[in-house]
């Protein structure tokens, strides 16, 4: 290791302070700025002080990043007069009125004299690169979700609609050779029944693809309609609780909540072997939470999932599109609890 005395550490630190692109500000215990390097003068003025409401920072600050927002002034640490050592991401306005992202640190460096250091490092290029990577990931996830949805629709069309239409086609062809009037009427009634069932299948598929009530009336109405249809089709009771009433949310959020709940219910139908499923939707502070709970078979999360596994994967994919998360708690023989949490 190089001997610090031989290279005059104080001189190097002074040169770093004077020539660094990092913005460095020193302040006393009262918040009065006592020194700043040239880089800091792009944002702060030597006449500024932040003894009361952190004026030197606040009058240039456009918000800091917290757990809920990229830019927010809510619960800012500078509102407290007892500021401890901290680091955070903040958006500051430069003297040419450009808003730039910075990584900031604030810490006590000389306890005897009460000297604090406030530093800012521009992270614009890092943020831009992260945003590009995030957009690329989201694009891949979106394309993957779309392809999975297309595959599902293709299977539904082939297994139900097309098969029923082929059945009708055969029945109609046979009518040409039917001479018995009574049998002809029976065949016609059978065709009528098949067509009616085909219409129901197409209608149900349309609702599954995108229920009109979701766009027109929101989650509450869409879920009530879907649960009623689900109970009629499968004989499984849905116990639904909610505190959102007719509250509307962002369209993307409503879509994700609807799809994740729908997928969780269908998984319970396929694998849980239950007579009822509990569904809860609630708004808690700045979060929208959806739960689907069954007391069925459960499964081992560490083992290979039944079926294709795309259902569980798709739920996580959808949640990530709106910065949400899906948590699955399950144990063999003790049921499954699927929880979706989305910041709003």
UniProtKB/Swiss-Prot annotation:
The role this protein plays is: Member of the two-component regulatory system NreB/NreC involved in the control of dissimilatory nitrate/nitrite reduction in response to oxygen. NreB functions as a direct oxygen sensor histidine kinase which is autophosphorylated, in the absence of oxygen, probably at the conserved histidine residue, and transfers its phosphate group probably to a conserved aspartate residue of NreC. NreB/NreC activates the expression of the nitrate (narGHJI) and nitrite (nir) reductase operons, as well as the putative nitrate transporter gene narT.
* Cofactor(s) the record lists: [4Fe-4S] cluster
Q: Name one GO cellular component term.
A: plasma membrane
Q: Which SUPFAM superfamilies match?
A: ATPase domain of HSP90 chaperone/DNA topoisomerase II/histidine kinase (SSF55874)
List membrane-spanning regions: none
Please report the name of this protein according to its UniProt entry: Oxygen sensor histidine kinase NreB
* MF annotations from Gene Ontology: 4 iron, 4 sulfur cluster binding; ATP binding; iron ion binding; phosphorelay sensor kinase activity; protein dimerization activity; protein kinase activity
Please name the Pfam families in this protein's record. HATPase_c, HisKA_3
């Amino acid at each position: 290791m190089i001997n610090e005395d031989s290279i005059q550490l104080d001189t190097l630190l002074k040169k770093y302070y004077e020539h660094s692109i990092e913005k460095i500000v020193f302040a006393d215990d009262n918040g009065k700025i006592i020194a700043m390097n040239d880089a800091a003068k792009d944002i702060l003025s030597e006449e500024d002080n932040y003894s009361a409401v952190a004026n030197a920072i606040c009058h240039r600050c456009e918000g800091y990043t917290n757990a809920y927002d990229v830019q927010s002034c809510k619960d800012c640490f500078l509102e407290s007069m007892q500021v401890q050592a901290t680091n955070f991401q903040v958006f500051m306005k430069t003297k040419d009125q450009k808003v730039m992202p910075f990584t900031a640190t604030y810490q006590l460096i000389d306890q005897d004299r009460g000297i604090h250091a406030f530093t800012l490092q521009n992270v614009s290029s890092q943020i831009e690169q992260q945003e590009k990577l995030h957009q690329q990931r989201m694009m891949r996830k979106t394309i993957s979700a779309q392809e999975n949805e297309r595959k599902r629709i293709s299977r539904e069309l082939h297994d139900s609609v097309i098969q029923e239409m082929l059945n009708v086609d055969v029945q109609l062809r046979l009518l040409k050779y039917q001479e018995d009037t009574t049998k002809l009427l029976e065949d016609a009634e059978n065709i009528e029944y098949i067509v009616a069932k085909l219409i129901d299948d197409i209608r149900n598929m349309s609702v599954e693809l995108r229920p009109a009530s979701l766009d027109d009336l929101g989650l509450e109405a869409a879920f009530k309609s879907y649960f009623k249809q689900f109970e009629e089709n499968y004989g499984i009771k849905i116990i639904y609780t909610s505190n959102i009433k007719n509250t509307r949310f962002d369209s993307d959020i409503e879509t994700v909540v609807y799809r994740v709940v729908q997928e969780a219910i269908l998984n319970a139908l396929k694998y849980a072997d239950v007579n009822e499923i509990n569904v809860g939707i609630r708004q808690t502070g700045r979060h929208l939470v959806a739960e689907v709970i069954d007391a069925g078979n459960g499964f081992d999360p560490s083992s290979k999932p039944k079926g294709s596994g795309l259902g569980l994967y798709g739920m996580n994919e959808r949640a990530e599109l709106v910065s949400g998360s899906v948590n699955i708690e399950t144990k063999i023989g003790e049921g499954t609890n699927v929880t979706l949490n989305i910041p709003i």
